[in-house]
Amino acid sequence: MRLSSLGEATAGSAAPAVVCGSRTDLYIACSCTEGQCSRADSMALNERGMQMDRGQARPAVRQPDERERKQRLVNRCFRESRVPDSESSPGTERRTAELSGFYTTKKLRSLYWTLRTDASLTAFAVAQERDTILISNRHHSEENLKLYQYDNVKSKLRRIQTITLPGGSVVACALPGPGFNVVMGEALRRTHDQLILTGHEDAVVNLIATSLEEGDARIIRRFNPAKYLRRLRAQYGDEAADMPWLQEIDSLRVRQLTPWRSVKTDATGFIALVNELIFIYTFDDTREPLYMHHFPGVESFDVNPENELLLALSGSKYGANGISLLDLTKMRGIGRQYAPAGHLKAFERAADSKHCLWLDKSLLVNSVGNILRVWDIRCSTGLKCEVLGHKSNITAVRYHKNSHTLYSCDEDGYIFSWELSHLLRELEGMTDVRRMTLCRSPQSIKTADDCSTTIQCGNIVVAPDTEFSSKRNSSVRSSSSRLGRLHLQFLGDGTLITLDALELGVHKVQDAKCYIAPSKNKLRRHSELPIKTLAPSAVSHAVESDSSLSSDSTLVERAQLEELHHDIFGSGFMSLDLHAEVDHS
């Protein structure tokens, strides 16, 4: 029998109907057989309701008002929330959303894979165009390059190929983008689509061409800075004795590799930091570098994103701030080197800066101990503000341009993210910003003057899990010194990739629903939205008890973790046993 409205049967109805109601005078009509109700969650018969004989006129049923309809919807959602997930009705999620039982926020999803303890990691690089990850490790006497591709949809790593290299150990590597493939020639480009740069302990740099699907890797160029320096030493003759950097040829080592391309000449090549020497090679000439000079105390460099002839240098011989600029416009001699006014002369107060990084064409950042300093090369003073929050020396710095987010990590294993969009807007307004701190930190705003000079924009991305690390023996932890520091890289969509001697991590910020738990008061449960309570949060273990260095995490379901529990790295890696996915608030 079909009901057209509450309590009114359509014409031609033959079966008797039962009017079901609650003691709150809410009436619900259903097509039940006489004497029983087929609804599992039906309410008791209204004390005033009577079973109607066939053909007997029904009493008029009062239509519920807006308040009663809303109350009925709440009660129905509450009853359905106690039904198992497999038996809940499809409309439950829609009605839950209508009642605002959750709110959407941003959370960090982290995946980890444990690395094999008998393989020494030596280098790490990422190609953002194809989400390709390159890891170099040394297993016994073999030097292997392993290429992986990350699937963001399935959250899995697929191993593409393994390349075994001759010669010394790989200590630096890079993955040039598709724009550099012109060096392979037309014939080779038909079968090969990826270039790999590798720097070795004996200062040799190899350019490798490979196919991501078919393999067939081959070395197409080999650069030997040591051989060039030997020829240079022979040319100088007796004068070479006054050049200490020419006496260190036998101990040369590649420390940093960066693909390089000239906009004016369209030449492609790379910049290499070999000991304290900076080399610029083009792929067309393997014998003579385009540029070479010795910079005492240099630790790292970075190329300006809009001017390939402007380099930032950081080191221990650049005064109190450890930062310098190198202009190679003329490509003759040393070029022009700049530093903040008078700072190059202050060697007695020289700072040891390990990292430098361009944020855009005019802003750059460098690290000095546990402090990050932001510089504006358009200003005479240069220094704009300091980034405070780390309690140990900073070991790596990376910047994601699209999201205006700066990432930094320290020796304790903390990774912080700094939202620089606030700073960029403040700089455009030429306000007096002096400090950037964590959102919750003892170094936050303390006085009224701090409101105009301090920006709170830092968040904890990853905190060290001391309980997990303590399970590893001391010999494993000591092997982390082989890698030197925690490496940070990005995929094309901004997903953060971290690598140290123990594990590979993939971290991505995504939207997450946070459900509102119902009240524990039984007398109020019928009037509140009943939503299934989530499992208790798991708190990541921090090194210190400082509240600013602790973060909440939510573990995912066991079924999702079991899908990740497999050997994904082959002979070089093994899967992590259940701390695989963690959401950091």
Curated annotation (Swiss-Prot):
What InterPro entries does this protein map onto? Answer: WD40/YVTN_repeat-like_dom_sf, WD40_repeat_CS, WD40_repeat_dom_sf, WD40_rpt
Question: Which gene underlies this protein?
Answer: DSE1
Q: Name one GO molecular function term.
A: actin filament binding
Native species of this protein? Eremothecium gossypii (strain ATCC 10895 / CBS 109.51 / FGSC 9923 / NRRL Y-1056)
Upper classification of the organism:
Eukaryota, Fungi, Dikarya, Ascomycota, Saccharomycotina
Is Cell cycle found in the keyword set?
A: yes
Q: Which BP terms does GO give this entry?
A: actin filament depolymerization; cell division; cell wall organization
| Function of the molecule | Involved in cell wall metabolism and required for the separation of the mother and daughter cells.
**One cellular component GO annotation, for this chain's record?**
cortical actin cytoskeleton
Q: Where is this region: Disordered?
A: 50-71
Name by which UniProt lists this protein: Protein DSE1
